[in-house]
Amino acid sequence: MKISLLIGILFCSTIFACGNKNEERFIFFLHNRFLETHELNELHPEFGRTEYREIIKEFENSGFKVISEKRNGNVNARNYALEVIEQIDSLINHGAEPNKITVIGTSKGGYIAQYVSTLANNPNLNFIFIASYRNSDIQNIPEINYCGNILTIYEKTDPFGVSTVERKENSTCKIKNFKEIELNTGMGHGFIF
């Protein structure tokens, strides 16, 4: 299922203001774990092909400058987040407004995005976490501390994505805006493909 249109609509219609089209807006898109160890054209045995290129293209067609790469190997989420933060800091140092920067992650990419939120500790950045929270995360990954404007999206039938309200309530950083969307597609974790 192509989630790019859904993300674009949600992005503009929920917690983030879409400003003047002449202003540069940046998206860091962080894909799921499957693509770390498989080629872009390989089919997931249960969910089919990941529409990575289509998602990037949709964001670009909507006027965003997209920063994304296909990760290779089983990368460490925290370490990769530090690399993303370096890029974000560079954009800000060159005049980009933090509120025009959004980090979007699906599944493992969502966990990387959560680390970016934590380690960047910038309440003006925007984040969309998709299918990337389990109830055990509070105990298993206690260092995550949401910071920024947060939108979470999860599928009701997906065991790898549930409500993040508990994480939000346990976070100590300022969260200006928080919205959560529960989908009911019946596709489980496959809705991110």
PLM region spans:
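Hydrolases whose catalytic domains are alpha/beta-hydrolase-1, hotdog thioesterase
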Residues: 112-116, 138
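Gly/Ala-rich beta-loop-alpha elbow adjacent to hydrolase catalytic centers
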Residues: 103-113
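Alpha/beta-hydrolase active-site loop
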Residues: 50-55, 73-96
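The feature captures the conserved acid-bearing segment of alpha/beta-hydrolase catalytic domains
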Residues: 126-190
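Conserved alpha/beta-hydrolase
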Residues: 56-75
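Bacterial Sec-dependent N-terminal signal peptides
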Residues: 1-23
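Conserved hydrolase catalytic core segment
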Residues: 115-125
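Short, surface-exposed "cap/lid" segments of acyl-processing enzymes
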Residues: 21-58
